[in-house]
Amino acid sequence: IALESIDSHTYQNYFGYILIDHDVDVKKGIKFVKKALEKEPNSIAYRDSLAWGYYKQHDCKKAKTIIEKLKDEIGLEDLEMKKHYDAIKECK
């Protein structure tokens, strides 16, 4: 199965996040996360993945915009999101 043909937004985000988080191919990871967001645009996890991808690309402005909105919406109870928030907050 070609990964590009996977139609499940859950798997698209998961695969994208793995590519991003492990610095395998951040650009490609963001592409997969954006595909997932097309199907679930309000997903907290998918938006967090996208913010993390932008952070990994040193696009601090985009990362901060997304992560601040998430913090305002749901707070920082999720440990993974809090880790991302703390790192992105320091991004320059």
Regions found by a protein language model. Give the residues of each.
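Structural motif corresponding to the intra-repeat A-B loop/turn of tetratricopeptide repeats
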Residues: 22-23, 57, 92
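Short coil turns that delineate tetratricopeptide repeat
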Residues: 5-7, 41, 75-76
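TPR alpha-solenoid repeat register
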Residues: 11-12, 46, 80-81
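Residue at a conserved register position within TPR or TPR-like alpha-solenoid repeats
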Residues: 19-20, 54
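Canonical positions in the second alpha-helix
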Residues: 1-2, 35-36, 69-71
